[in-house]
């Protein structure tokens, strides 16, 4: 069973529809035991870092997420919450992946938020990349990002490079929305769900 963490009342229709298309058995949940028993866990997120961390704290999930051994995927804000810190609201996050979510620099031809389609540049071979290449585009909506670093599986350029896909151990993050990224996003989600679970 796939646990989709639902703590903030976000509209998760696009994500749940994508999982249905992939034939995944999933539950929208904020129950700690259900999350711990899941084969895979997805942490979506829309809103601010503070609201996201507050919702996790109020539902008693911070320590739960920190001790998971199965694959955990953070999407958009969910990826940023996996990091050590966010400049948005100046708030500590889960600390599962080293790094800081920093405000993107706005330029004349690169307004913030970064909104729309952009392509991935894969840096490391990964099971997530299976069936994909550097010509594939995905859909972004974000103002904060992790600088490209050693944990980046894929990078993206929007005036400057940032991490688009990140991995440390069993913790994964996608700064874009795979559920809104057409066929490429479906491949990425399917690849994630195909990762071996140690739960």
UniProtKB/Swiss-Prot annotation:
Keyword entries, A-Z: Amino-acid biosynthesis, Cytoplasm, Glutamine amidotransferase, Histidine biosynthesis, Hydrolase, Lyase
The record's EC number reads 4.3.2.10, 3.5.1.2
Under the heading InterPro entries, the entry gives: Class_I_gatase-like (IPR029062), GATASE (IPR017926), Imidazole-glycPsynth_HisH (IPR010139)
Q: Which domain of life is it from?
A: Bacteria
| Catalysed reactions listed for this entry | 5-[(5-phospho-1-deoxy-D-ribulos-1-ylimino)methylamino]-1-(5-phospho-beta-D-ribosyl)imidazole-4-carboxamide + L-glutamine = D-erythro-1-(imidazol-4-yl)glycerol 3-phosphate + 5-amino-1-(5-phospho-beta-D-ribosyl)imidazole-4-carboxamide + L-glutamate + H(+); L-glutamine + H2O = L-glutamate + NH4(+)
The pathway to which it is assigned is:
Amino-acid biosynthesis; L-histidine biosynthesis; L-histidine from 5-phospho-alpha-D-ribose 1-diphosphate: step 5/9
Q: Where in the cell is it found?
A: Cytoplasm
Q: Active-site residues?
A: 76, 177, 179
List residues of the Glutamine amidotransferase type-1 domain.
1-199
One term under GO cellular component: cytoplasm
Asked whether the keyword Transferase is assigned, the reply is: no
What are the BP-aspect GO terms?
L-histidine biosynthetic process
Question: Its Gene Ontology molecular function terms?
Answer: glutaminase activity; imidazoleglycerol-phosphate synthase activity; lyase activity
> What function does the entry list?
IGPS catalyzes the conversion of PRFAR and glutamine to IGP, AICAR and glutamate. The HisH subunit provides the glutamine amidotransferase activity that produces the ammonia necessary to HisF for the synthesis of IGP and AICAR.
Q: What NCBIfam families does the record point to?
A: IMP_synth_hisH
> How the protein assembles, per its UniProt entry?
Heterodimer of HisH and HisF.
- HAMAP family annotated for this entry? HisH
PANTHER family xrefs: IMIDAZOLE GLYCEROL PHOSPHATE SYNTHASE SUBUNIT HISH
Put simply, this protein is called: Imidazole glycerol phosphate synthase subunit HisH 2
Annotated organism of origin: Legionella pneumophila (strain Lens)
């Amino acid at each position: 069973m796939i646990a989709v963490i639902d703590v903030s009342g976000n509209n998760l229709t696009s994500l749940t529809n994508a999982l249905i298309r992939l034939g995944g058995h999933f539950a929208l949940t904020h129950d700690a035991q259900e999350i711990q028993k899941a084969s895979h866990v997805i942490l979506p997120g829309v809103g601010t870092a503070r609201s996201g961390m507050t919702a996790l704290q109020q539902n008693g999930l911070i320590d739960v997420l920190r001790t998971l051994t199965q694959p955990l995927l953070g999407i958009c804000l969910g990826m940023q919450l996996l990091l050590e810190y966010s400049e948005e609201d100046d708030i500590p996050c889960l600390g599962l992946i080293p790094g800081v979510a920093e405000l993107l620099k706005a330029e004349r031809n690169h307004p913030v938020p970064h909104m729309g389609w952009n392509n991935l540049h894969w840096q490391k071979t990964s099971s997530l990349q299976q069936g994909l290449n550097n010509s594939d585009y995905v859909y972004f909506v974000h103002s904060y990002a992790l600088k490209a670093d050693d944990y980046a599986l894929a990078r993206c350029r929007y005036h400057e490079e940032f991490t688009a896909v990140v991995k440390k151990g069993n913790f994964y993050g996608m700064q874009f929305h795979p559920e809104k990224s057409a066929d490429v996003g479906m491949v990425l989600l399917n690849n994630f769900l195909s990762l071996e679970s140690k739960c």
